[in-house]
Structures are given as C-alpha cells and as structure tokens.
Amino acid sequence: MKKIAVLTSGGDAPGMNAALRAVTRMALHHGLEVMGVQRGYAGLINGELFKMDRKSVSEIINRGGTILRTARCLEFKQEEVREKAAQILKAYGVEALVVIGGDGSFMGAKLLSKLGVKTVGLPGTIDNDLSYTDYTIGFDTALNTVVDAINKLRDTSTSHERVSIVEVMGRNCGDLALYAGIAGGAEAIIVPEMPFDKDELIKTILEGRTNGKTHSIIVVAEGVGGSAELAKEIESVTGIETRATILGHIQRGGSPTADDIVLASRMGAKAVEVLLEGKTSKVIGIKENRIFDMDIDEALDIERSFDESLYEMANAINK
C-alpha cells in the first residue's frame, strides 16, 4: 500500500482535527502518501481531493471543527454514486480510505469496502451513540460545553429562583444528557431510554422548594424534546417561573479537551496500523482504555445499551 485518503463525514465533532493529524502523520511516518477529501462523501464524488503533508495538519491539534469540512451526502446510498467514488479513488491511486464520523458514515465506508476500497472508520460524534466503543471523539468536549452552560444557567436560576430546563444534543442517545446532568448536579435528567413521569418531576421540584432549594435544573435529551412545552406545564402547575434553553450547535464547537485530543490521536494512529496490517472494513474503538479494531458489520449490529445504574445513581444523589 502506497497511498491512503482521509475524510470527515456527517456532523462535526471536536477532536476531528486531532484525528486527521494523527492519521496523516502516522501514514507519512510509514512512508505512505496521504490525500485529504474535502466535504466528506459529497466532496469525494466531486473529486475534491488534495495531497496532504505534515504542514497540512500543523497547528490543528487543538482546533475545533474539521479543516477538511464536512457534509451529509444522501446520494451516497445509491450504488452508482458509490461506484463513482470508488473509481475516483482508483484514479488518484488511493488504496484505502479512513472515515471519521458516526454510524451513517460507517455505513458508507462499509458499502465502499464492498467495491474493493479498504476502509477504516473512526468514531467522531458528540452523541456517543456507537455501542461498540466506550467513548466517541468529541463527546468529552461537548460534555464540558454543556456542563459549563448548566453552571451559568444555575447562576441566573438561583438569582431569579426559577426552574431551568436545558435541552442537549444526542439524537436518541441519552449519554450526553446523563453525564452532563451528573456533572452539573441537575435535579432531574430526562432521556429517551428511561420512562418519564411529569407528575413525579413536579413533585421533585416542589419537594425541593419545601426543603429550601431556591432553583432547579432539569436536563432533557433532544430525543425526548418538548422542553418549551414542559416549561409551560411546570410553570402552570407549580406557579414557579420556568425557562427552557436549547443549547443547539454550540455543543459541536470549541477546542477539544485534552481527553478528546488524546483519544483522537490514539485512534488515528491505530487506523493506519490496521491498514498496514492489510485489514479492511474495520472501525476503531476504545474499551477499558484499550484501543482496538472491529469489523464494521459487527460494530453496527451491537445493540445500544444505556447505563441504567448510573441513571439511578444520578437520581439518588441529585434530588
């Protein structure tokens, strides 16, 4: 193998640049050429490839976003489009592709590998919704962003003696809400994986007031949604001023944390090692602080689990 390519796909995540840096420099270290693909699969089918060197990834390790830019590409589901992508890679002499993204990006890599392109996927998503790995690149940074927002909302909630609802990203995965709720000391955490009782929530808020609490923080995962409506209902029933804040895309931005940089660097280096071993259709993950590779098929088939014991602990200590 003489030449590889790398792209970022789907929603951006802090740490993607650190992963790009690791992939590029590890490949160059082993004498491989590296091509960067701009705008994910959409850029690939448009032939947006350029040669990368050490300077291309200089001083990006702590930058948020992705220097390659990213995009969603629904047409990549079409076989003729994927065949075009494979032909473009072949025309550039690219023998393997490293894909940094989420489950949709991995599916694209899996289908591309069936056309003879060696592929390896790195989990880059703030949602932490890939069950085969303990953590995804970007999750820790997003978590810290959310906790910072919760702490600031707590300041103003305390001043106004109100209830603050914070809606966070995560799609149908409640990990970001759960971890942020624990770290932010939220009185209630609402996630898609666990049943939610509005009456019990209102009871918790009122009991808090009886016990001397002057404010409450509620963290809601976007997979549940309805924060604005919930705020109106709480205020209507309790008479306590309640405000909802949807954090939105601020959760995807910012410089990656040290943990995300280290994780991205380890995973990026591992991706190149896996390709040099002749493997294909693999994804990189971390379990118990060990970096490993796994078949894409196997990884995508693992049913996502939710840490109910951690959720119960949060309920016990945060009320």
Swiss-Prot record:
The record's section on InterPro entries has: ATP_PFK (IPR022953), ATP_PFK_prok-type (IPR012003), PFKA_ATP_prok (IPR012828), Phosphofructokinase_dom (IPR000023), PKF_sf (IPR035966)
Q: Active site located where?
A: D127 (proton acceptor)
Which co-factor is required?
Mg(2+)
Q: Which GO terms describe its cellular component?
A: 6-phosphofructokinase complex
Protein location: Cytoplasm
**How is it regulated at the activity level?**
Allosterically activated by ADP and other diphosphonucleosides, and allosterically inhibited by phosphoenolpyruvate.
Its domain of life? Bacteria
Enzyme Commission identifier(s):
2.7.1.11
Q: Output the GO biological process annotations, alphabetical, semicolon-separated.
A: canonical glycolysis; fructose 1,6-bisphosphate metabolic process; fructose 6-phosphate metabolic process
Q: Name one Pfam family in it.
A: PFK
Q: Which UniProt keywords apply?
A: Allosteric enzyme, ATP-binding, Cytoplasm, Glycolysis, Kinase, Magnesium, Metal-binding, Nucleotide-binding, Transferase
UniProt-annotated binding residues for ATP: G11, R72, C73, G102, D103, G104, S105
Record field: catalytic activity: beta-D-fructose 6-phosphate + ATP = beta-D-fructose 1,6-bisphosphate + ADP + H(+)
One of the entry's Gene Ontology molecular-function terms is:
metal ion binding
Going by the record, the broad EC class of this enzyme is transferase
Binding residues annotated for Mg(2+), in chain numbering: D103
Record pathway: Carbohydrate degradation; glycolysis; D-glyceraldehyde 3-phosphate and glycerone phosphate from D-glucose: step 3/4
Residues reported in the UniProt entry to bind substrate: T125, I126, D127, R162, M169, G170, R171, E222, R243, H249, I250, Q251, R252
Q: Which residues bind ADP?
A: R21, A22, V23, T24, R25, R154, G185, A186, E187, K213, T214, H215
Q: What is its main location?
A: cytoplasm
Relate the protein's function as given in its record.
Catalyzes the phosphorylation of D-fructose 6-phosphate to fructose 1,6-bisphosphate by ATP, the first committing step of glycolysis.
Please give the subunit comment from the record: Homotetramer.
Q: Which family does it belong to?
A: Belongs to the phosphofructokinase type A (PFKA) family. ATP-dependent PFK group I subfamily. Prokaryotic clade 'B1' sub-subfamily.
Q: HAMAP family, per this entry?
A: Phosphofructokinase_I_B1
Protein name per its UniProtKB record: ATP-dependent 6-phosphofructokinase 1
Q: Supply the source organism for this entry.
A: Clostridium perfringens (strain 13 / Type A)
Gene name per UniProt: pfkA1
